Amino acid sequence: MPKIVVVGAVAGGATCASQIRRLDKESDIIIFEKDRDMSFANCALPYVIGEVVEDRRYALAYTPEKFYDRKQITVKTYHEVIAINDERQTVSVLNRKTNEQFEESYDKLILSPGASANSLGFESDITFTLRNLEDTDAIDQFIKANQVDKVLVVGAGYVSLEVLENLYERGLHPTLIHRSDKINKLMDADMNQPILDELDKREIPYRLNEEINAINGNEITFKSGKVEHYDMIIEGVGTHPNSKFIESSNIKLDRKGFIPVNDKFETNVPNIYAIGDIATSHYRHVDLPASVPLAWGAHRAASIVAEQIAGNDTIEFKGFLGNNIVKFFDYTFASVGVKPNELKQFDYKMVEVTQGAHANYYPGNSPLHLRVYYDTSNRQILRAAAVGKEGADKRIDVLSMAMMNQLTVDELTEFEVAYAPPYSHPKDLINMIGYKAK
């Protein structure tokens, strides 16, 4: 009976194991997870902190016991894979509760260890990061136990913005700092102005080009020379792949610690796959490498690997489009395609439209800003971005589908909109992009 070992039990690992079991009732499947919880919703964590998700149990899909009862898959939490011997096809496992080490053999190995939050490295009892449910519980308990009021949020990416919003909605008083003036880097810089407007509207302090120099108890000294007091600090300064344990194997890593994979999510070593935040692949619509550590990619990779292990040799990954979205108070920011800093590799033109998200005479209308970049050689879409209080998600998903099917910007005139006054226009923003491009 084949043995399948999975490293990591969150989005990629648990999903892949579950999909394998759906297709293969016989194989022995075991998952090693180094942390306390399995199969939790990473994307829910800021909303658990903000008490938007009122019961944290809603963010936890399975326990190991429930997973085994439903799927006959063994999950061992607090078990960390610390080394891989790909020649013997074994992994070395550390039981983090007992410090016992043992070896486990495999026929197929699926690596989905995820990523860890970067830290600024200050020794402080008031500093936290947010990556898993344990972090979420620690933050929530600290807030309650210490009557936290003033919170410093460091960083201005998706996680930091979501955390800041949820702290504010919880009734706390957050302040945002970021080490540069470039915030929310997946969006075009000039389309991020509503983030600052939303902060100003709520009188939430923020400082760009600012960093922490020292932490002494609750006293924070900044690069600017300011000295302020905070009850708590939450760092959102990026992540790094959990690939240290892979270095002793023959598995190839790139310079950033990611595992390059082929279109079957195979590594360079036979019988070993990599999925989720640790894997890097390529874009679907252009010939560039792409690392997209988001939920859709982990779930798609999990399904592809499961199909292959179950015997479908023809299924392949066609590449990322990098579709992403974030809510920040009243606004939605969404984009798809190459990153802003990758556009310089193309000869491109940009076309944009700003108009109401739905018919102007229908109540509640607000501006929606839609922007599309296209390749001048073939007029296919390279990137699109949308910002507004409504309708950004709808338009970016339509453009994602257009890119998936290699439509040109001109063909957007033929997009048949689902029109009624509360939703759109007879000639929608997407149509207008096509007309303006001509």
From Swiss-Prot:
Annotated binding of substrate, by residue: T15, Q19, R22, S39, N42, K71, H299, K427
EC category name: oxidoreductase
Family: Belongs to the class-III pyridine nucleotide-disulfide oxidoreductase family.
Co-factor: note: Binds 1 FAD per subunit.
Transmembrane regions: none
GO MF annotation: an example: NADP binding
Residues bound to FAD: 8-33, 267-277, 419
Cofactor(s) it depends on: FAD
Miscellaneous remark of the record: Reduction of disulfides occurs by a thiol-disulfide exchange reaction, but involves only a single catalytic cysteine residue that forms a stable mixed disulfide with CoA during catalysis.
InterPro entries in alphabetical order: CoA_disulphide_reductase, CoA_disulphide_reductase_staph, FAD-bd_OxRdtase, FAD/NAD-bd_sf, FAD/NAD-binding_dom, FAD/NAD-linked_Rdtase_dimer_sf, Pyr_nucl-diS_OxRdtase_dimer
Protein name, UniProt field: Coenzyme A disulfide reductase
One Pfam short name: Pyr_redox_dim
Protein keywords: FAD, Flavoprotein, NADP, Oxidoreductase, Redox-active center
Quaternary assembly: Homodimer.
PANTHER family the UniProt entry points to: NAD(P)H SULFUR OXIDOREDUCTASE (COA-DEPENDENT), PYRIDINE NUCLEOTIDE-DISULFIDE OXIDOREDUCTASE DOMAIN-CONTAINING
Catalytic residues as annotated in Swiss-Prot or TrEMBL: C43 (nucleophile), C43 (redox-active)
Binding-site list for NADP(+): 151-166
Catalysed reactions, semicolon-separated: NADP(+) + 2 CoA = CoA-disulfide + NADPH + H(+)
Domain note: Contains 2 FAD binding domains and a single NADPH binding domain.
EC number assigned by the record: 1.8.1.14
Function recorded in the entry: Catalyzes specifically the NADPH-dependent reduction of coenzyme A disulfide.
